[in-house]
Curated annotation (Swiss-Prot):
BP GO terms, sorted: lipid A biosynthetic process; lipopolysaccharide core region biosynthetic process
Organism per entry: Actinobacillus pleuropneumoniae serotype 5b (strain L20)
Name the UniProt record assigns to this protein: Tetraacyldisaccharide 4'-kinase
Keywords in alphabetical order: ATP-binding, Kinase, Lipid A biosynthesis, Lipid biosynthesis, Lipid metabolism, Nucleotide-binding, Transferase
GO molecular function: ATP binding; tetraacyldisaccharide 4'-kinase activity
Reaction it catalyzes: a lipid A disaccharide + ATP = a lipid IVA + ADP + H(+)
Length: 326
């Protein structure tokens, strides 16, 4: 939300509630650390990929990148997710290539389709881990989000920061967009900066598109084929302008853009009304998993891949591999 990027009279009116939010979260964290509130220790190491702010920071591309890197190095990895946006009430549940994004959430389906990783969803992280370990022999559990879920003990914490928006106005909810203060970053093992300019203690990540995929046929086109072409773009992610800016920076001529709420379910008529049949409709990969069943001929999704420097790649992976004895 733009209101969280600066301070205004609304910020100060909400500040007392932010103070209350911060106090409650600190008391809760203290109770977990003192073992007054129970937490679960997984039989295998747990790595959390999370953030300290709300909105799209790029966690899912990091999870996909991490899983692929570990798979290439022989690590048997599983992923757990809350399954935000899904309607299913059957938990815990394994997600497969045939799972419906409407039922289990868009991000879990995307991760499984990209990596083939064993993935379970549930609000109860312990149940998800136990389900995975009962069915797969795993070396490591990666949790997509859940930095503030202190009922799950963790061995490694990565935090993804939006390199453009950073920490907004610096307030926690509801006066600002932070779940925890930036001082929380002092205790994590890695800070990943998504775009913008990374600080000295951060690893810069870029999200790079290489091609577009037709939702109906699976045909792939180089993304350069859309340079100068008139298109319409939609994005139902945490921060839609990031996707639109990426397309415009590539040279795509956007006639219209439409942002939707993160994890929002789409109605066919809702999207068909946005673009004439001859105009390409571009969307994110996360949106595509919800639209394939009613996609039109000229609908395309643009997958992005996380890219790190060789130095950052080594710095991020070596502590994990060392811990696992790989």
């Amino acid at each position: 939300m733009n209101i969280w990027q600066s301070t205004s009279i609304i910020t100060w009116l909400l500040a007392p509630f932010s103070l209350l939010f911060w106090l409650v979260s600190q008391i809760r964290l203290f109770l977990f650390r003192k073992k007054i509130l129970k937490s679960y220790r997984s039989p295998v190491p747990v790595l959390v990929v999370g953030n300290i702010s709300v909105g799209g920071n790029g966690k899912t591309p990091v999870v996909v990148w991490l899983v692929e890197q570990l798979q290439q190095r022989g690590v048997k990895v599983g992923v757990i997710s809350r399954g935000y946006g899904g309607k299913s009430k059957d938990f815990p549940q394994l997600v497969t290539n045939q799972s419906s994004a409407e039922m289990v959430g868009d991000e879990p389906v995307l991760i499984v389709q990209r990596t083939g990783v064993p993935l379970a969803i549930s609000a109860n992280r312990q149940q998800s881990i136990e389900l995975l370990l009962n069915q797969f022999k795993l070396d490591l559990i990666v949790t997509d989000d859940g930095l503030q879920h202190y009922a799950l003990q963790r061995d490694i914490e990565w935090v993804v920061v939006d390199g453009i928006r950073r920490f907004g106005n610096g307030f926690v909810l509801p006066a600002g967009g932070l779940r925890e203060l930036p001082s929380r970053l002092q205790s994590v093992q890695a800070i990943i900066c998504n775009g913008g300019k990374a600080q000295p203690n951060e690893h810069l990540m870029t999200l790079e598109p290489e091609f577009a995929v037709n939702l109906r046929t699976g045909e792939q086109k180089p993304i350069t084929d859309f340079i100068g072409q008139e298109c319409v773009a939609i994005a139902g992610i945490g921060h839609p302008p990031r996707f639109f800016n990426m397309l415009e920076n590539l040279g795509v001529k956007l006639l219209k853009t439409q942002g939707f709420a993160d994890h929002q379910a789409f109605e066919p008529a809702q999207l068909k009304a946005l673009a004439a049949e001859q105009i390409p409709l571009l969307m994110t990969e996360k949106d595509a998993v919800k639209c394939r069943t009613f996609a039109q001929q000229n609908w395309w999704y643009v997958p992005v891949s996380a890219k790190f420097s060789p130095e950052s790649t080594a710095c991020l992976l070596e502590p994990i591999l060392k811990r696992l004895g790989k």
